[in-house]
Curated annotation (Swiss-Prot):
Pfam families: Aft1_HRA, Aft1_HRR, Aft1_OSA, bZIP_1. The gene is Atf1. InterPro entries: bZIP (IPR004827), bZIP_sf (IPR046347), bZIP_transcription_factors (IPR051027), TF_Aft1_HRA (IPR021755), TF_Aft1_HRR (IPR021756), TF_Aft1_OSM (IPR020956). PANTHER family: CYCLIC-AMP RESPONSE ELEMENT BINDING PROTEIN. This is Transcription factor Atf1. Residues 389-403 are annotated as: Leucine-zipper.
Length: 458
C-alpha cells in the first residue's frame, strides 16, 4: 500500500476543518434561537418609549368608521325643500307634488304672485304713494291711464305665467276672489266718504250745523288698508278703464300750502258762520280780533300780533307780499286750536334766543372796543419811538458832517500824510457829504429792501 501524498493530507485536513466549522455553526444556531415575539400589550403593561407596538390608541374604536361605515339611510318622515320652479310659480301644476308644502292657499299662488306683480319700475311706480306721510287730501289711487311710466295701464307687460289669469279677468268671468275685491273696495270707499277734502260741499254742511266747532284736519294721510283695497280693486278689474268721471286737482309740490288751503276752506268758513250767530271768544295769546273782521284788516292784525319789543318787525309787516299774508292767515287759523302750551314754549324759546344774541353782541362790542384801544396805544408807542429814532439819525448825520469837516480841515497835517490819508480824504470827502458814506463803492450800498438814512427825515 502506497503512503499518502502531501496533497491528500492537505485535502483531508481541509475537510476535517470544514466539518468542525459546520458543527460549531449548528451548535451556535441551536443555542442562540431567536427570542419569542412579545404578546399583545395589556392595560397593565407600561408602554415603551421606543416601541411603537405598545401604542394604546390603536385599541380605541374609530368613531368615523362607525358613523360612515354603513349605508346612509334617509331620515324617516323628513320634508324636502321646494324646488326653484315651485318658489317662482307655485300655482303651476306638478310643482307642489315634489315637496310636502301646500301652496294652493298661499298668497304666492293667487293673483298676487311674484310673476304677476313685477318689481318697482322707478320713482313713478303705482305703489310709490303707499306709506307716504303727507299726500294731497283729494289725491286718489284709483287712476287708470294717468300713471306716469305706466304705459296707459296700471301694470307693465304681464309675464307669460299671468297672461291666462289676466285674460280670464278681462273676459268678465267673476271668480270668488274678484267678488271679494269688489266688496273690499266698496267698504273702503264708504269708510273714506267722510274724509276731509278740498271740495266746497263740506263747507255747506259745516255752515248748516252751527254747533260744530272747528277742528284741526289731521287725517290727511291715506291708510294702508285703503291703498291695499284700491290696489286689489284695480287688480280685479283687470286693466279695464274706469267709467266714473273723476275730477283730480293738480298735486301741489308744497304740502304746506295744500294744508293751509284745506284749513282755510274747512275751518275758516265754519268759524265765520259761527261768528255771525255767537260772539267770538277772545284768544288766550295776544290781543287779536275775531275771525269775522280778519279778512278786512290783515295788516292791523299782523301789527297787533307782532311782539311789543320789535318795532322793526311791525314796520316791515306793513310791506309783506300776498304769500306772507297767507302764512299769517295760516298762523291765525292755527291759533284757534288748543296749542297754548306749545305756543308759550316757543315764545319762551324765542325770548331766550334773543337774550343770548343780545349778550353775545354786547360781549363782541366790548372785545372790539378793547382791541381798538390796544391798537391805538401801540400806534402811539410806535409813533413816539419812530420820532425818537428820526431825531437820533438826524443828530448822527450832523455829527458825521462835523467830523468830515474836521478831517478836511486837517488834510494837510503831516500826521495824515504820513499815514497816507491825504489821497483818501481827497477822493472820498472832497465833495462834502457823499451818499455812499465811508468811501464805499456804489454797488456796495444799501440793498433795495433797506431804508436809506435820508428817507428817515420827516
Amino acid at each position: 500500500m502506497k503512503p499518502p501524498t502531501r496533497s491528500q493530507n492537505r485535502s483531508d485536513s481541509q475537510a476535517a476543518s470544514s466539518q468542525k466549522d459546520q458543527k460549531s455553526n449548528v451548535e451556535n444556531q441551536t443555542s442562540l434561537a431567536p427570542p419569542p415575539r412579545p404578546g399583545a400589550p395589556t392595560a397593565s403593561d407600561t408602554p415603551d418609549y421606543f416601541n411603537s407596538m405598545h401604542n394604546p390608541f390603536s385599541l380605541e374604536p374609530n368613531p368615523f368608521e362607525q358613523s360612515f361605515g354603513g349605508n346612509p339611510a334617509d331620515t324617516p318622515g323628513k320634508s324636502l325643500l321646494p324646488s326653484v320652479a315651485a318658489l317662482t310659480s307655485p300655482a303651476l301644476p306638478g310643482t307642489s307634488s315634489a315637496s310636502g308644502y301646500n301652496w294652493n292657499n298661499s298668497l304666492r299662488s293667487g293673483p298676487l304672485s311674484p310673476a304677476m306683480l313685477p318689481g318697482p319700475t322707478g320713482p313713478n311706480d303705482y305703489f310709490d304713494s303707499i306709506g307716504r306721510g303727507f299726500p294731497t287730501p283729494n289725491e286718489s289711487s284709483l287712476r287708470t291711464g294717468l300713471t306716469p311710466g305706466g304705459g296707459g295701464s296700471m301694470f307693465p307687460a304681464p309675464s307669460p305665467n299671468s297672461q291666462a289669469l289676466l285674460q280670464q279677468l278681462q273676459n268678465g268671468g267673476a271668480t270668488p276672489s274678484t267678488i271679494d275685491f269688489h266688496r273690499t273696495a266698496l267698504a273702503a270707499k264708504k269708510n273714506n266718504s267722510n274724509a276731509p277734502t278740498s271740495n266746497p260741499n263740506e263747507q255747506e254742511q259745516a255752515a248748516a250745523n252751527m254747533d260744530v266747532k272747528p277742528a284741526r284736519p289731521a287725517d290727511f294721510t291715506q291708510h294702508d288698508a285703503a291703498d291695499a283695497a284700491n290696489g286689489l280693486f284695480m287688480l280685479a278689474k283687470g286693466g279695464q278703464a274706469n267709467n266714473a268721471p273723476m275730477n283730480h286737482a293738480p298735486m301741489s309740490n308744497d304740502t304746506r300750502a295744500a294744508a293751509r288751503r284745506v284749513s282755510q276752506n274747512t275751518n275758516g268758513t265754519s268759524a265765520e258762520d259761527a261768528s255771525d250767530h255767537e260772539p267770538a271768544k277772545p284768544a288766550k295769546g295776544k290781543g287779536k280780533k275775531n275771525t269775522a273782521k280778519a279778512p278786512a284788516a290783515n295788516n292791523r292784525r299782523k301789527a297787533e300780533d307782532a311782539p311789543k319789543g320789535s318795532n322793526k318787525r311791525s314796520k316791515s309787516s306793513m310791506e309783506m307780499p300776498s304769500d306772507m299774508d297767507d302764512e299769517d292767515d295760516e298762523d291765525d287759523d292755527m291759533k284757534q286750536f288748543p296749542m297754548d302750551t306749545k305756543k308759550m314754549t316757543d315764545e319762551e324759546k324765542r325770548r331766550n334766543f334773543l337774550e343770548r344774541n343780545r349778550v353775545a353782541a354786547l360781549k363782541c362790542r366790548q372785545r372790539k372796543k378793547q382791541w381798538l384801544a390796544n391798537l391805538q396805544n401801540k400806534v402811539e408807542l410806535f409813533t413816539s419811538e419812530n420820532d425818537a429814532l428820526t431825531a437820533t439819525v438826524t443828530q448822527l448825520r450832523e455829527e458825521i458832517v462835523n467830523l468830515k469837516t474836521l478831517l478836511l480841515a486837517h488834510k494837510d497835517c503831516p500826521v495824515s500824510q504820513a499815514q497816507g490819508l491825504g489821497p483818501l480824504m481827497m477822493n472820498g470827502m472832497s465833495a462834502g457829504y457823499d451818499h455812499h458814506g465811508y468811501n464805499m463803492p456804489p454797488n456796495m450800498g444799501m440793498q433795495p429792501g433797506g431804508i436809506p438814512t435820508q428817507g428817515m427825515r420827516r
